[in-house]
């Protein structure tokens, strides 16, 4: 289950990219976050969307 349930506080489109509007979520699944590609082990448990690349500036 996605820990970021944007449907409770806004809208979240998890397709090719993750776009949340008016959402109070601070994290989302790697599959929903553009900064965490499917092969990114750094974000295996989730990530905070800070960028579009898989590095320390993206995930924390």
Curated annotation (Swiss-Prot):
Keyword list (alphabetical) reads: Metal-binding, Metal-thiolate cluster
Where is a divalent metal cation 7 bound in this sequence? 49, 54, 58-59
What are this entry's molecular-function GO terms? metal ion binding
Amino-acid positions noted as binding a divalent metal cation 4 in the UniProt annotation, renumbered to this chain: 32-33, 43, 47
Superkingdom of origin organism: Eukaryota
What the entry lists under InterPro entries is as follows: Metalthion_dom_sf, Metalthion_dom_sf_vert, Metalthion_vert, Metalthion_vert_metal_BS
| Residues engaged in binding a divalent metal cation 2 | 6, 12, 14, 25
- UniProt: a divalent metal cation 5 binding residues: 33, 35-36, 49
For region Beta, the annotated ranges are: 1-28
Residues bound to a divalent metal cation 3: 14, 18, 23, 28
Q: Where does a divalent metal cation 1 bind?
A: 4, 6, 20, 23
Ranges for region Alpha: 29-60
Q: Does the keyword Metal-binding apply?
A: yes
Q: Which amino acid positions bind a divalent metal cation 6, per UniProt?
A: 36, 40, 43, 59
What function does this protein fulfil?
Metallothioneins have a high content of cysteine residues that bind various heavy metals.
Family classification? Belongs to the metallothionein superfamily. Type 1 family.
**PANTHER family tied to this protein:** METALLOTHIONEIN, METALLOTHIONEIN-1X
* UniProt comment concerning the protein's domains: Class I metallothioneins contain 2 metal-binding domains: four divalent ions are chelated within cluster A of the alpha domain and are coordinated via cysteinyl thiolate bridges to 11 cysteine ligands. Cluster B, the corresponding region within the beta domain, can ligate three divalent ions to 9 cysteines.
Protein name (record): Metallothionein B
Gene field: mtb
């Amino acid at each position: 289950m996605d820990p970021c349930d944007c449907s409770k506080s806004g809208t979240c489109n998890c397709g090719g990219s993750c776009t949340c509007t008016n959402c109070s979520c601070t994290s989302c699944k790697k599959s929903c976050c553009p900064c965490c590609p499917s092969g990114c082990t750094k974000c295996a448990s989730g990530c905070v969307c800070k960028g579009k690349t898989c590095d320390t500036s993206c995930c924390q």
